[in-house]
Amino acid sequence: MPWLFTRDTPALRHMADLAEALHRSVHLVAQVAGTRGPEADRAARELEELDSSSSATLMAFLTALRSAYVTPLPRQDLYRLASGVHATTRRVVSAGVLIQRADLEELPTHALDVLETVGRQAELLARGAAEIRDLDALEATWMQLLRASRRTERIMVEWLADLGMDLLQRDYNRQREVAWALHAALEALSRVNMDLGMVLVRES
């Protein structure tokens, strides 16, 4: 059956909020390395609060979705996309906690590049939440997501290949742990992009 369209739904606004939380998590994690004392405590608190806020937004999204009379896409598709963005945020936050505990003075350039491209994808996902009723516009955004995802994958491969070059064993272990933590976030984000592609194929 064709899906009915409403002018706006709280569920879609919550989806945009989840994408914004992902963007904020990237911004926080990019700044967490090298923090000490009260500044480190503040950074840890902000990461924890962001994680909790994102979880609350997902619950609000689910409530709005269950109470909606009509939705622009099947409910299970919307939930899969929203929960995927939330999972990505949680993994980025976990990477931030790891970076802080690893006591890194600064993030490697590759890590900053990865975070930058994840932030770009978060912006595109927020745009996609507003385009769900326009499949042509959503497909164009999805193509940009794929390009950004491929760039992130290339950066990650270069980073992993460069690990161990001119690094002490202790620094190597720290960078490897951070790299794999961010890789987990990239895998979650890749699943979101794949799920969005499946929606586009089915609804076209």
Model-derived features: where do they sit?
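Cytosolic, long alpha-helical scaffolding segments
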Residues: 1-204
